[in-house]
Amino acid sequence: MFRDKKIKILECIRQGQIGGGESHLLSLMENINLEIYDPVVLSFTDGPMIERLKEMNICTYIIPTEKPFDIRVWKKVAALLIKEKINIVHCHGSRALSNVFKAAKNLKIPIVYTIHGWSFHEDQHPFLKRLRIMSERFLTSRADVNIAVSKSNMQTGKKYFPHFKATVINNGINQQKFNPANNFKNIRAEVNVCESDVLLIFIARFTSHKQPLSLIKSFAEALKINPELHLLMVGDGDEKKKALKIIKQLKIEHAIHFLPFRQDVPDLLAASDIFVLPSLWEGLPIGLLEAMSMGKSIIATNVDGTKEIIQNESNGLLIETDNLVHNLTNAIVHLASDKDLRKRLAEKAMQTVSDNFNATTMTRKIEKQYSTLILNKNVLV
């Protein structure tokens, strides 16, 4: 099917910090067939993902920029494509694609674009939303293959872009790594939480769309009803300083525990009882899948992507984003007080991930897109 040489793929992503897209890329690199493909990763910032890729002996490059459509880096990207003799460019997210498409098109290298959630949303300022819709329309039209991580992402694309086409390939996770039967570190002892207390966990960037501040306010209300609750918040971001200020004002420092981003996510999840994801929007949240695979009961918002995974009262609790603090408080109180419900939801959540969201299956589907593109574009390897 292929020539003697391996197919060289440049995987491009906006940052080296760990988020959903970066976790997706790590899973792809862990499972890609190295007998056929020779992956190279380009990130536009440094971070823990880069260190993990180096541990995996994946060739990595950093071309520093935090701006989309940054013409200052386009020549550097072109030089990298030529140096590494890249056959396919695979961009994860719009910022990465905006800084790579020009060089790839000039060199006639086919482009795959994975949409990890759109960059435009209903709660944005109308001008900003309009600008981002124009940007996404332009970028998706430059890709030879568009991959949507959820059906809702594909449907949104079709709604806004008349000629938009995409293949849906759901995110998948390493279910051996996120297996509750494994041995784990005692995180509760590290953060001084008793085994008998109910521990909620939030693992995400501290950004407005993840709503960490709403979670803190909701937790404070729930704590008045159930004083044996604790909340572990793991991550970094713009709203972390505000979060620390709010818990001090509310005088609940004893019940909320902060940790920076960490690699030992399975250990963190193993220590918890309830995983909370109060996002305003999602693509197909990998952190949610990891928590479900670890047998955690879920509270999440009824938003695109998430609602393709969670069925309310079946494998988790879905709440509306309208009146979020009130809805989240009620869900926390309800689930924290009902151990049998937590057990039932967790068991169903594990089954959902086992049946539908496997990283190996995801990777094989992406590889099929690569091989089809090579044949259709008659790319010399």
Predicted regions and their residues:
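A conserved mid-protein helix/loop that constitutes part of the nucleotide-sugar donor-binding site
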Residues: G19-S27, V198-K224, D238-K245, H326
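Short hydrophobic beta-strand element within catalytic cores of glycosyltransferases
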Residues: V41-S43, S297-A300, I310
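Aromatic "clamp/platform" in nucleotide-sugar-dependent glycosyltransferases that forms part
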Residues: F261, L280
